[in-house]
Structures are given as structure tokens and as C-alpha cells.
């Protein structure tokens, strides 16, 4: 086992009672602490509760917001707590300018890229089933948001992911 997650709160569809989601999320954070494992968080339409629970339970030293969907305010709140941000194909969507602002302010050692395959295919593959190989489009989107070359994003995100997950140890 290399991490706890993905876990967290999803209020978008309200398929699960929120009080139970909060209770289970707190227990998952406790487990990450007990096992000294990274925590991979999924949060959707639940930022305030997510941060409240993290503050109450204590954020594990290695915590990443997988498929980060927030804007600059949520990014700052996560980064100030020591969390990492991981960007998916959403970064390429025309409807995501605030997400691109968040990517621009993430420190070089605090962001990663991902696909969230089979979901959220990046532009120009939007509407299709996503594939891991399309992470290059995500990298291009992050590079554009940060105003850097895609090779810089590849190097920074690989270094961050390697450190975060203990790859190559």
C-alpha cells in the first residue's frame, strides 16, 4: 500500500449522507496518520467541510488534492496547509480559467499532473474515454497556465510525484 485514498467528500450528487461522508473521511485521515501514508483527497463541492475536517484531524504531511477543481482561493487554502495539487484534463477545458489560475500559483514542488482516466478527457480528446497516455495534454495545459515549457512541467511534476509516492526509492 502506497497511499490512503482516494477519499474525501463529494456533495455534487448527494448520493451519500453528508454526515456519514464527513465521519468516514475523518477516519480515513486518521488511518493515513496511523500508517504514515500519503492521503489522496477527492473533494467536490465540499471545500469548506474538507478543510474543516483536515484542520480538526491534522493534515498528513503528504496530502494531495487529486483531480483538483478549485480556484486560486482553494489552492491557497490547500497549499497553506502543506498539501499538493494534482491537475487533470479539466485544466484544458475552456470553462476552467480559475483552475488555470490555481495551477499558475502552485509552487514547482507542490503540483502533479494526472488523467483521472477513464474520465475527464482533455481537449482535444474531450468527449472520449480518457487514456493515461493523454497526460501529455494535461502537461501542456499546465505549462500554458504557468507560462513555462512543457518539459519544465514534465520534470517538475515527475520530481514531485516521485518524492510524494516514494518512486525510485
Residues of each region from the PLM?
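Conserved, mostly hydrophobic/aromatic
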Residues: 6, 32, 66, 78, ...
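Mid-to-C-terminal alpha-helical segments outside catalytic/metal-binding sites
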Residues: 31, 133-169
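Distinct, well-ordered alpha-helical segments
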Residues: 43-58, 64-65, 71-80, 98-103
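Charged helix-capping and loop-helix junction motifs
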Residues: 18-29, 47, 96-104, 128-132
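Glycine-enriched alpha-helix->loop->beta-strand junction motifs that scaffold or abut catalytic
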Residues: 27, 34, 55-62, 77-88, ...
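Short acidic/histidine-rich active-site segments
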Residues: 5, 109-131, 153
Amino acid at each position: 500500500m502506497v497511499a490512503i485514498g482516494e477519499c474525501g467528500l463529494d456533495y455534487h450528487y448527494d448520493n451519500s449522507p453528508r454526515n456519514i461522508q464527513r465521519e468516514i473521511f475523518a477516519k480515513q485521515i486518521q488511518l493515513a496518520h496511523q500508517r504514515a501514508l500519503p492521503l489522496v483527497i477527492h473533494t467536490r463541492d465540499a471545500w469548506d467541510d474538507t478543510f474543516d475536517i483536515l484542520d480538526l484531524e491534522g493534515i498528513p504531511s503528504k496530502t494531495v488534492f487529486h483531480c483538483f477543481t478549485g480556484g486560486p482561493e482553494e489552492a491557497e487554502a490547500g497549499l497553506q496547509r502543506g498539501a499538493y495539487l494534482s491537475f487533470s484534463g479539466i485544466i484544458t477545458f475552456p470553462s476552467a480559467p480559475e483552475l488555470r489560475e490555481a495551477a499558475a500559483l502552485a509552487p514547482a514542488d507542490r503540483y502533479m499532473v494526472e488523467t483521472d482516466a477513464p474520465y475527464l478527457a482533455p481537449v482535444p480528446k474531450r468527449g472520449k474515454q480518457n487514456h493515461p497516455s493523454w497526460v501529455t495534454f494535461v502537461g501542456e495545459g499546465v505549462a500554458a497556465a504557468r507560462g513555462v515549457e512543457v518539459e519544465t512541467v514534465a520534470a517538475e511534476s515527475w520530481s514531485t510525484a516521485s518524492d510524494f509516492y516514494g518512486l525510485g526509492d
